[in-house]
């Protein structure tokens, strides 16, 4: 009975399970057949990415700017290091006019000597070139100008001469030019250190005279031979093309050889031939700039070429000899000696002023806004008076010494 009851129980449970499974299947089928399946959730709208669109443009701009600055930097390096070796770039130096003072050699011939970075001339060579005062000359000298600064020469100004081409400029102007160049500012003729030999020592230059034996030998020359008397010519040059040719003619006061055979003139570019008949001839040795170097403007159509070239020539004679032969139209030895002593003492004056401290003008300021009275310090005024007295005594002594040497 127990077994039959168990069988009955299992059969009842199985039947109940079958019925329940059938009901669930029917509900699922009905549900799936009557209602549609749920739709998937919509995808979010795509957002526009501004960063991704700007990235290519930014990259292009950065690349262009990088290339531009790189080229600029390379160009600056080229100008700084390469061009300066050719002598065409100015740089600063401690002199008066912002041009570098290079040391260690000078430009000689076609190459650079001593490791110089430009084609300028050594400072010692520049300072050895002759100088003279413009006020020591007379004649048609009004309106003459410096070809570098285009300023007219004043009587108190100091000029420096280039011995070969015999062009004169302000000392500051030509020194500044020659610090970076090795040629004349006008004719571009090369200035070599050997040019100093054309001038030599000023004292020996002006004190040189014929001895009696030499004068006798000159007077006893046989007929038919010519005697060469050196003629000294030192020229100033100006850049005013509109100046009258009459003012730019050669300043020359010729002296007769018969009157005083002892007097003569040294020459840089020509010699004076005097034959036995007493006639004088001037023979050029082609050192003049216009004769030596053909300018590019030679192709210009000029009606009167000689008068045009005469506008750019102005010669100044430096003569030596007896005191009676000294002329106001010439640069005298005393002028050069006085000039050199004055230039040396001017440097001493600057040194004394520097030792006395930074002197400031005693008085009110220029703008009159501060109202602060500026006074001298460190005893600058007594030092200046002492230096002035020393300079005056030295100049008087040098002038007397030069006058006695000329006599």
Swiss-Prot record:
Keywords: Membrane, Metal-binding, Signal, Transferase, Transmembrane, Transmembrane helix, Ubl conjugation pathway, Zinc, Zinc-finger. SMART domains: RING. The chain crosses the membrane at residues 57-77. Coiled coil: none annotated. Pathway: Protein modification; protein ubiquitination. GO terms for molecular function: transferase activity; zinc ion binding. It is a single-pass membrane protein. The RING-type zinc finger domain mediates binding to an E2 ubiquitin-conjugating enzyme. This is RING-H2 finger protein ATL43. It comes from Arabidopsis thaliana (Mouse-ear cress). The lineage of its organism: Eukaryota, Viridiplantae, Streptophyta, Embryophyta, Tracheophyta.
């Amino acid at each position: 009975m127990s077994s039959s009851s168990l069988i009955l129980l299992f059969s009842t449970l199985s039947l109940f399970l079958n019925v329940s499974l059938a009901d669930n299947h029917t509900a699922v089928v009905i549900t799936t057949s009557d209602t549609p399946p749920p739709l998937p959730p919509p995808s979010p709208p795509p957002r526009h990415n501004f960063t991704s669109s700007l990235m290519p443009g930014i990259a292009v701009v950065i690349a262009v700017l990088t290339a531009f600055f790189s080229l600029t930097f390379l160009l600056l390096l080229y100008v700084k290091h390469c061009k300066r070796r050719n002598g065409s770039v100015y740089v600063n130096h401690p002199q008066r006019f912002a041009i570098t003072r290079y040391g260690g050699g000078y430009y000689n011939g076609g190459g650079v000597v001593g490791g110089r970075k430009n084609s300028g001339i050594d400072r010692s060579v520049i300072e050895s070139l002759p100088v003279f005062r413009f006020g020591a000359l007379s004649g048609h000298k009004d309106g003459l100008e410096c070809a570098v600064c285009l300023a007219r020469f004043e009587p108190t100004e100091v000029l420096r001469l280039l011995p070969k081409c015999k062009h004169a400029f302000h000392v500051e102007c030509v020194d500044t030019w020659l610090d970076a160049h090795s040629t004349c500012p006008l004719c571009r003729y090369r200035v070599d250190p050997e040019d100093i030999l054309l001038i030599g020592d000023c004292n020996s230059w002006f004190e040189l005279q014929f001895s009696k034996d030499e004068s006798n030998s000159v007077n006893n020359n046989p007929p038919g031979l010519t005697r060469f008397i050196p003629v000294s010519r030192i020229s100033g040059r100006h850049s005013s093309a509109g100046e009258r040719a009459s003012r730019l003619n050669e300043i020359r006061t010729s002296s007769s050889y018969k009157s005083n055979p002892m007097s003569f003139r040294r020459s840089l570019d020509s010699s004076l031939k005097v034959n036995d008949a007493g006639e004088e001839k001037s023979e050029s040795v082609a050192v003049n700039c216009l004769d030596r170097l053909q300018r590019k403007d030679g192709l210009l159509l000029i009606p009167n070429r000689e008068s045009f070239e005469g506008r750019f020539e102005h010669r100044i004679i430096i003569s030596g000899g007896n005191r009676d032969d000294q002329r106001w139209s010439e640069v005298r030895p005393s002028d050069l000696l006085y000039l050199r002593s004055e230039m040396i003492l001017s440097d001493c004056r600057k040194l004394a002023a520097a030792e006395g401290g930074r002197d400031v003008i005693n008085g009110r300021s220029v703008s009159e806004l501060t109202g602060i009275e500026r006074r001298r310090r460190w005893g600058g005024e007594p030092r200046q008076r002492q230096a002035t007295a020393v300079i005056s005594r030295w100049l008087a002594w040098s002038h007397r010494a030069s006058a006695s040497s000329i006599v």
